[in-house]
């Protein structure tokens, strides 16, 4: 099906272009979302009449998105989840969780604007892409931890596995010292 794009669509084209897409993609996504019109004579004429208005509207939303992007870019948000000792989450962190974390911090971000390559299933710092406008994309960091204290440690650069290894090494050292003291005490008797 041929459609006229009313806004820039990633991997498809710019506003005003007539592109060929699969019927289902047009019917189920582009047309209902208002991102495109069917490419027939009457729609092409009406688009040409509205083109200046649509470009002005697109420029305005891009400016608003750029203003939000300036504040949002590089921000870090803490997401508290329960996890195993090895750092594997019970469940996963999804786009909804990322959007809620950003909203709680005072940013207006919808879950459809968050782009995850795959769901986050382990503790640590994860970089996530936020598409505020088709032409305005920023990166944020999600700090996934079991507690606020753990999140602060991760933010300072220490991983959970490193901390567990340090604690285990310290415990082994204390046990070795204890045996040395017991051995020294038994030799004195």
From Swiss-Prot:
Identification of the protein by name: Large ribosomal subunit protein bL9
Function: Binds to the 23S rRNA.
InterPro entries: Ribosomal_bL9 (IPR000244), Ribosomal_bL9/RNase_H1_N (IPR009027), Ribosomal_bL9_bac/chp (IPR020594), Ribosomal_bL9_C (IPR020069), Ribosomal_bL9_C_sf (IPR036791), Ribosomal_bL9_N (IPR020070), Ribosomal_bL9_N_sf (IPR036935)
GO cellular component, one term: ribonucleoprotein complex
An example Gene Ontology molecular-function term: structural constituent of ribosome
Pfam families: Ribosomal_L9_C, Ribosomal_L9_N
Family that this chain belongs to: Belongs to the bacterial ribosomal protein bL9 family.
Keywords for the protein's UniProt record, in alphabetical order: Ribonucleoprotein, Ribosomal protein, RNA-binding, rRNA-binding
One GO-annotated biological process of the protein: translation
């Amino acid at each position: 099906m041929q459609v006229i794009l009313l806004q820039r669509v990633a991997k498809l084209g710019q506003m005003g272009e007539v592109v060929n897409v699969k019927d289902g993609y047009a019917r189920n996504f582009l047309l209902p979302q208002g991102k495109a019109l069917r490419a027939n004579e009457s729609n092409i004429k009406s688009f040409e009449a509205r083109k200046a208005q649509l470009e002005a509207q697109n420029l305005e939303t891009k400016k608003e998105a750029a203003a939000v992007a300036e504040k949002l870019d590089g921000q870090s948000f803490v997401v508290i989840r329960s996890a195993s000792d090895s750092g594997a989450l019970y469940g996963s962190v999804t786009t909804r969780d990322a959007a809620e974390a950003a909203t709680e911090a005072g940013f207006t971000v919808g879950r459809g604007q968050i782009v995850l390559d795959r769901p986050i299933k382990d503790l640590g710092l994860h970089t996530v892409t936020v598409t505020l406008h088709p032409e305005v994309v920023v990166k944020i960091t999600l700090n996934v931890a079991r507690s606020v204290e753990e999140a602060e440690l991760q933010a300072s650069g220490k991983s959970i596995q490193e901390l567990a290894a340090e604690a285990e090494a310290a415990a082994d050292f204390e046990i070795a010292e204890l045996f040395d003291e017991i051995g020294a005490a038994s030799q004195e008797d």
